[in-house]
């Protein structure tokens, strides 16, 4: 999946969270040298859990790989991708590559028909506010609207009439209506101060600009949102103005087994057989379906091999402009440790879900496990790419060319000549802190850490702030963190806490002062269970009350645990306080240098802002054979029966006995060379006439290194074909009103009305 998962590595303890994940099942969100840690528990699990040292991970230089002299490896033309911006539309490139020249109106239609929704992308697909996205982007909302006795995630949801569509909360659909360039103003302000002040000045100015632009459009209640978007690591800065829609209802979502057919085994693979789609509807302020001219009609005729396609969506994050030293640090330290944390937490979650199915359903833990599993697969694939000497050699070639271009210009050399070297020094500083980085990987994430431990962390700060007579507003802000920490089942709370304590012991060593003070000769699980049972902070409501009335003290068991490991935590925090601003400034200067040298010929890294990626419908070689371009319902049923209906390939009853009119020849999924990443999930796949031919939901395994390099030879995006969507709506779900709307644009309030019109 390729949605952009922000729940892991979010604002919680931001200096240490360090990750924005991809849930696609592909694209999706990003680590070990060979051999990688096992993804499932094995007899060697205890060995795999030991923290690898930097020395273990660094391989000696290899001049030849499979007969290839690495010194002769050259970068590809599109190694840095094809995620083109709407600020600098690739008009000439499209004309050269695809044989037509889109005008300004074409790009405007593409921009206004697209939407950004939570962690994903979407689009208007009818003049009546109908919105198409992925099923995996809708899971949380499907769970949200399930009534008592319903299990809509498993059973699916279909609104047969307009009145049956169900309102969803916290769904924001953002339509990009304007882009305003502020690069000169921002760069002038940054250049006017010393290097140590630039980060703070930049942040302050961006906040000021954002507030001013929003005020010009009517303020916070205007229905507009403004976001400052920095491209090229700050080399370009613009205000993106969005029309935000929040009155949204769920219209249709297939069963989980259909939207995620094949489960984890088929994730990030092709051939694929998924109906990973869902439909929402935007309503206006009067409660009527939104009337809009900005939508993409369905192209029910579909595509053929060699056809060009365009994916318009919001890729979440890439690091294709990072230096080789930064990538090597990720490979050897940060991303590797994060991957191991994901694998450990997956085992904890899986064990709890199996032992407590009802509690797991109540806390929506299956959705969390799906996201975590997806992220684990993404990070594993990206790390494997970073271990590929040829990929690193291509990145080194790109970096050499960049440095040479800087050196060739005296003015650029004076300003930017030492940036790459200085960035390498910063990475070495961080390497020195590898043990504490591992011990606190994604620390504070509410889905990967104990809620009690997180509350203890914030509670300690509340207590200290009160003792130091901090301003009431600051204390209230810290209390918000306690309030927003979600409630967790006590058994899962203790298991996650024990897993964190085990990591601290593994990475820091059992003799480390923090570990010794924390465990005192006991096992991590013994300590965790005593804390959960003995603290006032294991229940969110009680925790808030205790902090408000002062009954929660430094002697609380959870607070004492935080005090025990705090010195090690602060060691890492101090490092990031020291090098973080410098690293950010170096990245911004490198971005400016790249833009001055290459201009818009090299697309910027993804920023969860709107992009357009072109591609061609074509296959690729894999596993000694050739992948088909299209899969069909024939293959879908073959997959089910070949696996004897096992869990990941099981089918709901309505699919086990389909009507004889279901056309099994219908194309179901297809692949293209379009460049995507986490956040693109739900993006419309368009033909040259801006008609929808599919909705992208994943990438193949070969696309996983796409975080840092685009390899068009085998990188493929995976898309649900609209012909399969229409066939399923018509023949399986009997939703004639949606088929009518998607094929003609006509809105029917009921199935009976739609039947009469058809």
Tell what function each PLM region has.
Residues 2-4, 10, 19-758:
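Terminal presequence/propeptide segments associated with secretion/organelle targeting
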